Amino acid sequence: MNGSNGEERVVHEVAMVVPKRVLEEEEGDCVEVLVTELRKKGMVVDRVVGLAHEFLKVAAPSEILGNAAAELHIRKPTRLGIDLPFEMQGSEAFIRQPDGLLFSWFERFRCYQHLIYGIVNSGGHDVTLKLDGREFCWTAGESLLRRLESEGVIKQMFPLHDELKRKELLQNWALNWWNCTNQPIDQIYSYFGAKIGVYFSFLGMYTQWLIFPALLGFIVQMVDFGSLQFLALPSFFVGTILWAALFLQFWKRKNAALLARWQINCLVGPSQGYRFLGMEWSSLPFPKELIKNLGNERAKEKEAYQRYEWFAYRKRFRNDVLVIMSIICLQLPFELAYAHIFEIITSDIIKYVLTAIYLLIIQYLTRLGGKVSVKLINREINESVEYRANSLIYKVFGLYFMQTYIGIFYHVLLHRNFMTLRQVLIQRLIISQVFWTLMDGSLPYLKYSYRKYRARTKKKMEDGSSTGKIQIASRVEKEYFKPTYSASIGVELEDGLFDDSLELALQFGMIMMFACAFPLAFALAAVSNVMEIRTNALKLLVTLRRPLPRAAATIGAWLNIWQFLVVMSICTNSALLVCLYDQEGKWKIEPGLAAILIMEHVLLLLKFGLSRLVPEEPAWVRASRVKNVTQAQDMYCKQLLRSISGEFNSLTKPEQEQQQDSERF
């Protein structure tokens, strides 16, 4: 928010959509009351009249955001290396963000929500609000925005793009084709938040690491090794598994380094257990009551924690078993039936018709599975929204895993048709990339164009004019017409990163689990990912609204899914090698086949061994964390000892005075 001359640059970061006024301004107009209350809070409000709605653009100076952060007790890292609740008076002691601002995008949006939703009727009596002849009551102590939302006055509230930073990111990132995988990660984090910043860092690192298996796969696919040809595929298989295991371990190190660089502590905040017990860290007795009650309450607290923990585990386990059994009993027979019918049909026209019917049914089943998963998750006990989102990822990925790979397994294990398998892999890698690129680029733009067209047509009908072109001049109205960055499944828990991460995980599983059948797939994936970085960047900066920030700073459940796919790759590629070398189909344990089985077990051991050999955190991150924890413990212990000493002196001082008085007499 800093201007070029050292003055604070006013940036409208939040917009609210309200109805366009039909009647003349009247006393008690609810929109006027909202604008007045926002300005009383110290915020800057700009009113923009659009075609069918009015827009309130809201900005908050740094001082106002700082006061809100202090009220929210937002913990921030200080220059001493200790995370402390923010206080505006000591703002210079807190570390600033990479873009020079005091608060991250996630923290600023939290402050905006606190300020806007914190407007309550503190007058002690009800207030009558009006809108175009309609009246409703704003009761004492009620949130104004909640009331306006329930009455349909506030249509939407969404974050706005910062035009200056957006254009800078367009030049340095989305349109900078010379840097294939190098991205301004700090700028992405500052503008979009930690979740999107971590995703693009992961995508860039994954694309860079793909260069090695892409070159190796190109050599294996194109070069004839003569008498040593039978060793080419097993060697390539071993190399790709070791590459994948090392990549995931080094990604954990990079993720830890990013969190340390951005001063993000993932462990901040009380756990669900304390909320379950009716306790918060801020409500714990301190310090004399804590010492007195600690021994009495420890047994009860432990018992309550155990009941809560196992009850939550039991509900999650029940839902997971239900989802797995549904996939096995319902989706697996359907996928096998489609693969079998597709294999025996000879007419290409019937195959296309069958595929179209299959895709329609699959879309319905996937959306149905997503809705069922969300309902099951709502009945679980999860510590946060991110835990619920991870639970959704596991359940929905099971559906997509069955859809994507069961037909390929059918071709491999039953028909052993490697030519058909390669054709299927090429088609899915190329067609899926073209499909996802078209969906990412064209679908949001088509939605945006259709909404603009509908608004213009409605305006022409209201004005009664059939000639002349109606222009949309305001930037905020253009952003209002843009679609949101939302997930195709489970929009209550996930945003558009779900679809992007799902696409990447399915691609990784495709090239890894069938690496021996088509080594050139890694090269296709590398080229695809370079395009993916640019298309996703353009999508976020041009065709979509600015996404809502999320607190998560890791790729979450997707890391476990990638590790699962590595283990599956060891098993599937071993099966591919067995099918390739067992040409007679007798499944005899000959020396070659026995060597493949031994290699499979060795690779499984190496995969888990590498996770122990390569530390998940760089040494400097670990040392910095230990230093910060030590400093925090020292300061807390000194404060606790001073408090106990003060209370002890206050208790013993009257006794000493009485003793001195008795000695005098």
Swiss-Prot record:
Entry function: May act as a calcium-activated chloride channel.
Alphabetically ordered keywords of this record: Calcium, Chloride, Chloride channel, Ion channel, Ion transport, Membrane, Transmembrane, Transmembrane helix, Transport
Disulfide bonds: none
Transmembrane stretches, start-end: 200-220, 230-250, 322-342, 344-364, 392-412, 508-528, 551-571, 591-611
Coiled coil: none
Transferase as UniProt keyword: no
PANTHER family membership: ANOCTAMIN
Protein name (record): Anoctamin-like protein At1g73020
InterPro entries noted in UniProt: Anoctamin (IPR007632), Anoctamin_TM (IPR049452)
Domain of life: Eukaryota
Topology within the bilayer: Multi-pass membrane protein
Family membership noted in the UniProt record: Belongs to the anoctamin (TC 1.A.17) family.
Localization in the cell: Membrane
Lineage: Eukaryota, Viridiplantae, Streptophyta, Embryophyta, Tracheophyta
GO MF term list: chloride channel activity
Organism: Arabidopsis thaliana
A cellular component annotation (GO) from this entry: chloride channel complex
Pfam families linked to this entry: Anoctamin
